[in-house]
Amino acid sequence: MSDFSQTVPELVAWARKNDFSISLPTERLAFLMAIATLNGERMDGEMSEGELIDAFRHVSQGFDQTSETITIRANNAINDLVRQRLLNRFTSEQAEGNAIYRLTPLGIGITDYYIRQREFSTLRLSMQLSIVAQELSRAADAAEEDGDEFHWHRNVFAPLKYSVAEIFDSIDLSQRVMDEQQQGVKDDIAALLNQDWRAAISSCEQLLTETSSTLRELQDTLEAAGDKLQTSLLSIQDTIMNNPHNLEFVDKLVFDLQNKLDRIVSWGQQTIDLWIGYDRHVHKFIRTAIDMDKNRVFAQRLRQSVQSYFDNPWALTFANADRLLDMRDEELTLRSEEVTGELPPELEYEEFSEMREQLIALVEQALHKYKAQQIPLDLSEVMREYLAQYPRSRHFDVARIVVDQAVRLGVADTDFTGLPALWQAINEYGAKVQAHVIDKY
């Protein structure tokens, strides 16, 4: 979790005072990544000037540059990376002229983005979420203990701040890399279709299928772990509310982690929805191109036949056959079973948006009696009754609809007292709601 304690003017003055600047042309960036790759093979994490020159020689060969001035250009490149604080140079009086070099945190961060962050896989995500689950579980257990403020700092705040938050940031960064990779796939598909769409159909289909499969696997992994992580965070939050110590710093961190987790989980579903739309667009383009090309080829052949009739006479025979109806659905969801998964039988022919509209209408009608008869509305009891009628996967959506409709009816007098409402369970899976009884319509 990134926290900025300095103000914008302070950061600007700091950057100006230290003369920070980064300029990495393609050659310099390739050199930096070569250093990081070779450095990863060394136990001490240090490289000599000769090893850096050897790395630069590989880069120079890759860019087809002359080998006559390699030493001079390598020294210039090394000095440039040192000046930009991407490399640290260490010298000693005992070994004068034999400096050693280490990558700075900035250099590691840049190379990590270009090299390691692109290794985003379901296995890596599963391992990260597993570590987060263990840390959150330990933090929740520590929160249950009756400890002082130092105990909360050491056993709750520290793991959340320096382990869970950093892994969340790593997952968030990886998702942003996935966004770039999807854009790269779109560019590849566009290039294939512009060159020769006939030959590109199978390649486009493979790219679309692989990306859809990857997104679905990642989303399944996120959804499987999301509920457990959110439960641990809610447990810590409940403990904070009942603790006499001033734990606002922990409460704020937990709130930030909840928002981060929500963004991470929602990213997957949103990305899948956008990719389905793009998938349809590509297939519709291919179908249109096939139809247009078919007509264009026929028209071209007919034109040539008419022009060469006297050289090659021909006869036209036609039959009035029964018309064949094209039953293809232009709006067919392509590979929906692969992208969105199989629906249960009772929902097979229903869209979620239609279900949501129907549910809103039913809830609105059911809650109207409270306003008409001036009956106090206990939100926890109403939500408990509704959630019992639906599977667990729909509880969040149903609860949100019930709350949206309930708050439109009126407010609670006790809201104006400033006293917090009690947390009350609304299902068997640990979900709770905090709301006063609505009695003023």
Swiss-Prot record:
One protein family per Pfam: MukF_C
A GO biological process held by the record: cell division
Keywords: Calcium, Cell cycle, Cell division, Chromosome partition, Cytoplasm, DNA condensation
Entry's localization field: Cytoplasm, Nucleoid
InterPro entries according to UniProt: Chromosome_partition_MukF (IPR005582), MukF_C (IPR033441), MukF_C_sf (IPR038198), MukF_M (IPR033440), MukF_M_sp (IPR036141), MukF_WHTH (IPR033439), WH-like_DNA-bd_sf (IPR036388), WH_DNA-bd_sf (IPR036390)
Coiled coil: none
GO-annotated molecular function: calcium ion binding
One GO cellular component term: cytoplasm
Annotated segments matching region Leucine-zipper: 208-236
Coarse class of the protein's main subcellular location: cytoplasm
Subunit structure: Interacts, and probably forms a ternary complex, with MukE and MukB via its C-terminal region. The complex formation is stimulated by calcium or magnesium. It is required for an interaction between MukE and MukB.
HAMAP family on file: MukF (MF_01803)
Family from the record: Belongs to the MukF family.
Role played: Involved in chromosome condensation, segregation and cell cycle progression. May participate in facilitating chromosome segregation by condensation DNA from both sides of a centrally located replisome during cell division. Not required for mini-F plasmid partitioning. Probably acts via its interaction with MukB and MukE. Overexpression results in anucleate cells. It has a calcium binding activity.
Protein name: Chromosome partition protein MukF
Species of origin: Pectobacterium atrosepticum (strain SCRI 1043 / ATCC BAA-672) (Erwinia carotovora subsp. atroseptica)
Gene name per UniProt: mukF
